[in-house]
Structure formats: C-alpha cells, structure tokens
Amino acid sequence: IFAPYFKFNLMNKLLIVGTVAFDAIETPFGKTDKILGGAATYIGLASNFFNVDAAVVSVVGEDFPKEYLDLLENKGVNIEGIEIVKGGKTFFWSGKYHNDLNSRDTLVTELNVLADFNPIVPQAYKNSDVVLLGNLHPIVQSGVLNQMSERPKLVVLDTMNFWMDCALPELLDVIKRVDVITINDEEARQLSGEYSLVKAAAKIHTMGPKYVVIKKGEHGALLFHNKDVFFAPALPLEEVFDPTGAGDTFAGGFAGYIAQSENISFSNLKNAIIYGSNLASFCVEKFGTERMETLDKKEVNARLKQFKALTQFEIELEE
C-alpha cells in the first residue's frame, strides 16, 4: 500500500512558475479560437517525460475550464499552486505568425488576473531541487526565490526583451540569483550590448548565471559555461505548424532532465539541451498543446536517436 507514496517522495522536485493561459493563434496554416496556453502549461507537459515530482505555481480566472487543470494533473503535474481567482478572467494572448514562422505580431494581450499575481509556493515544494522561473515580471520571479526554504540545486530563468525594456533593474536583480538563463539571440544581444553571441554570453556570465543558454529557434541552441561552448542543432522538420510554446517546452525538457538526473555538470547540461530540443521539435507539429498531450516516450526516444545521428561523424585526426 505504501510503495507508490514512498516512491513519490523519493523523486526530485521541480518547481515551475509561469503563466497558465488562453492563447488564440494564427499561422499561415490556420487559426484557432481560445485554446490552452501559457509558459507553465508547456513546461509542465514537458516535465511529464521525466521521473520528477513537478508542481506549477500560477494563477487563472474562474473562466478557466476544469478539464485543462485535469489535463495537467493527469500528466503528473501538481496543481495545488495554481490559484483560481473568483470572478477573475484568465490571462489571454493572441498572436499572428508571419510566413517564415520566425516572427510574429502580438494582436492582443489581456493580463487579467495575472496583473495582480502574487505567487504562493506550496509548503511541500519550498525545498525543490530545481526551480524553473518561467517568463514573468522579474519581481514575481524574485518573490518565488524568496519563499524557498533552502537554495535550490539549480535555478533556471526564462525572460524576454519586454522585461529588458520596462523592468531592467528588477530583471538584473533576479539574474544575479540564478544559475542558468535561457533567452533568444536577439535578447542576448540586447541584454549584453554585444553583437557576437560569444561575447554576449561572457558578459551575461558576469551578471550572475554560470550557464547561458541562447535559443536560436529553428537553428538550435547554444550553451555557454565560461570558455566551454556546446551547440545543439534543431532537428530539420518537414512540418512546422505552430511555434508557440516551443521555447517553454525546450525549457521544461531541459529542467526536467536536470531534476531527474541530479547531475549539474557541463556535460550533463549538454544532454539536457538535447532533451529540450527534442521535445520542442514535437511541440511545433500541431497547434498549441495538442501534440504534447498525445506524445509518448516511445516517440521521444525514437527521435532522440535521430538527434544523435544528426551530429555524429567519424574523423580520424592526425596528431
């Protein structure tokens, strides 16, 4: 009788903080009405592929369907940290992607209950091994770290240019406190003031993070640690349907792998980046969370083999 409970307690804890939201997406391939979205949603769905005890801290309105919360719970995500605001409306984002899918226009952003979000970390997760701070106001991200009962083994921060524009001092404060930052190439250049990504990463290291992950969308991701650099390719896909959530899925795969393996070394972070890229490659195949909802471990492992083949080569180097 006690075995499952006992096993559950032995799993490493992953605390995920981010948005749980409604999205409406338009791409050259079609458009959706309001569907399930939000960074913490994608991160949570990605964490399901690892042997971790994951919990989401977020906020939704009374208009948020119970079936969406059930979906997360059925995928093994603890949802006690998702606050439901009576009479409130859930955060809503609508965007339209251009033909190349690399750029998009935000059509609507309604913060709704997110405007007053004050995250409360459930007692059982105040000692989480890994904390993933999804893209939110830096003050909210700092507020989460302040609630931890002990320093997590790894803190991963995701942020974006919006916060660099309107909350830079607060952002720099939280960056000081994290081990890993994940941003895209444009954001790395903006944050550092350096065009070369190698120089940008070196500058960001001096702000606090030991590891800098620079996401380059369909061109993969770079991992920097002091003088070490690793490049993870993105799998060339025949069909890219909707890039929404790919970056969050990547972060969820990255953090989930680290939380499961407990090994925080450069060589293991390389594996984590491959796991993140692998999961993100599935996410883009359908609208919203649709593909991540049906994805199984067999498919994930089969594609991991493709990732390995993508970059394996044998060259005999003469001394």
Language model features with spans:
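Alpha-helix C-terminal capping segments
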Residues: 44-53, 257-262
